Design a protein with these regions (language model features):
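N-proximal helix/coil linker or "cap" segments that precede and/or mark the start of modular domains
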Residues: 176-229, 239-242, 288, 292
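Conserved redox-active cysteine motifs that mediate thiol-disulfide chemistry
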Residues: 242, 250-267
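Short pre-active-site segment immediately N-terminal to redox-active cysteine/selenocysteine motifs
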Residues: 244-246, 251-254, 286, 321
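Structural microenvironment flanking redox-active thiols in thiol-disulfide oxidoreductases
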Residues: 259-298, 305-315
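Thiol/disulfide oxidoreductase modules built on the thioredoxin-like
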Residues: 295-300, 305-349
């Protein structure tokens, strides 16, 4: 009986030690919390400012992450073998990537921390870095990390790297090679890592949307049908305009970048009203905000009302930026994608 009690006591102590926060992680968390607290306090000053001058003043005092990046990196380097150092590497790689410490942390993802747990978000963020830098790191994590979230993130990010290579390819052979590699990685995410999420978003869902884009939204593909209603509830379809060149614009009143493009689109709609060219929008505001945007920017082309940036139409097109412009040929095939007004005008001879 006594030996059983001793055994149970040992197990309890072990559990308590295991549950105790890692000292390195706690030290890093304290630095991050201090920085984030100061940022929040400054943000509240901007929100509560009574005049534009006050807002400008407080915008000029937004705390820099530089000092905190230096502190976090020192803790990481002093405790490289501590599991809690992964938090510092993740934060530096995602929140301080523009500083030297952030660049060092990116390399750590593929070296000292390639087997660490808790770095999945930082690994996924490598999809946005140049492939020459990111690919060796992603492959190191994919091959050596024993944790499913990290392996899934590396596989997904590799898929996105090759997806972007495909989008940027200027010759058919390079495009097909990149497309094949992207599909291979995305299919692995869908089949092997179907349950993995990062920041609450299932990677398999993101991979599925991008595979759909590769298969159905590439230049030369026939654009999927769009069937919806405008803000007043009148229904119409993309196929109603077959026989005309169609410019698609995904936009919203909430989108500051759209504000400068909308007047140009209005001018283009006016200039082409007697030609076999039509501009159709996909608006991503809630109905009341959509009506306000139509008035504020005097929008003179018809738009489907999608309700949000994750509405049914927008989701199909797997958008990453706003505004997004497409040009479709009269037969419905995509001729330009993620393009700009100047390229559209040149293609149409305007």
């Amino acid at each position: 009986m006594k030996s059983l009690q001793i055994c149970l006591l040992s197990l309890c102590l072990a559990a308590q030690l295991h549950a105790k926060p890692d000292a390195t992680e706690a030290a890093i968390r304290a630095v991050i919390d201090e920085y984030e607290t100061k940022v929040r306090a400054n943000t509240m000053k901007i929100i509560e400012a009574k005049t534009e001058e006050e807002k400008i003043k407080h915008r000029g005092t937004i705390p820099s992450a530089e000092t905190y990046a230096t502190q976090v990196m020192k803790i990481v380097q002093d405790h490289l073998d501590a599991p809690g150092s992964a938090l510092g590497v993740k934060w530096l790689a995602t929140q301080a990537a523009n500083f030297p410490e952030g660049q060092i942390a990116l390399q750590m993802l593929g070296t000292s921390h390639s087997k660490s747990a808790g770095i999945a978000a930082a690994v996924k963020a490598l999809e946005y870095h140049p492939i020459t830098m990111a690919e060796p790191i992603l492959k190191a994590v994919r091959e050596s990390n024993p944790n499913l979230p990290e392996k899934a993130a590396a596989t997904y990010a590799l898929g996105m790297q090759y997806f972007r290579l495909y989008e940027a390819a200027t010759d058919e052979k390079a495009a097909e090679t990149a497309k094949s590699k992207a599909m291979e990685y995305f299919q692995e995410v869908s089949s092997t890592y179907a349950k993995e999420t990062i920041d609450g978003f299932p990677l398999a869902d993101q991979a599925a949307r991008t595979m759909f884009e590769l298969a159905n939204l590439s230049v030369g593909s026939e654009c999927p049908e769009i069937d919806g209603k405008d803000v007043d509830g009148s229904g119409f379809k993309l196929s109603d305009y077959r026989g005309k060149s169609v410019i698609l614009m995904f936009w919203g009143g909430w989108c500051h970048a759209c504000h400068g493009v909308l007047p140009q689109m209005n001018q283009l709609a006016t200039a082409t009203k007697d030609k076999s060219i039509v501009i159709l929008g996909i608006n991503t505001d809630i109905p009341d905000e959509a009506r306000k945007a139509y008035q504020d920017y005097q929008v003179n082309f018809r738009s489907w009302s999608d309700g949000t940036t994750s509405g049914p139409i927008t989701s199909i097109f797997n958008l990453r930026n706003f505004p997004t412009l497409y040009l479709l040929e009269p037969n419905g095939k995509i001729i330009l994608k993620n393009t700009n007004i100047e390229a559209i005008k040149a293609q149409l001879g305007l």
